[in-house]
Amino acid sequence: MRTRIGSAGIWGAMIAMFLVELARGAIANDAELLRLGALPDNGQIHHEYWRLITCAFLHWDLRHLLLNTLLLFLLGPIVERRAGTMVLLIIFLSASVASGAGILIKHEIWPAEGVSLGASGGMFGFLGAALVLVFRRPSPGRLRILLIAALILGLIYSFLPNVSMIGHIVGLIIGTTLAFVVPLKESEPTVVDA
């Protein structure tokens, strides 16, 4: 599965922000991550709405970054190949912003310990979109099974401590919903070696 331009762009932005985190000593540092754009634990962003986007490009540590970039590498091309680069970017940004908003609402009601950040809302958006898109356009049965397995594992993972279930669920709902309404990209021709 080759990487597409939109997937590569998101990947590049996540890596660039992680390098900024390293340079600023922000790895696992709530105060510095807040300065870079993470979501606060009390749900109060004081009209700093840009945090709904920046939080998606920040990661707590290298493990967190690697998990989200692996998901991007696996799911991004599935969505991008079937729906196009613009749809991929719309799904990522919409799922990430909605996920961040869901987290803020939850934190307003039940304050959390520590900042919220990461691209998992966007990745769950891709997972929901990929599931819909592989059923909208005929795809290999094993890809469908793998995506369903990924959904089950992702939902189980959402129950772990310090993982934002609300962020994952909101991202999944947004990605799934958008994938039902976006136009499918025309199939790419298959190259057959003679």
Role assignments for model-derived ranges:
Residues 1-194:
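A detector for small-residue-rich transmembrane helices and their helix-helix packing motifs
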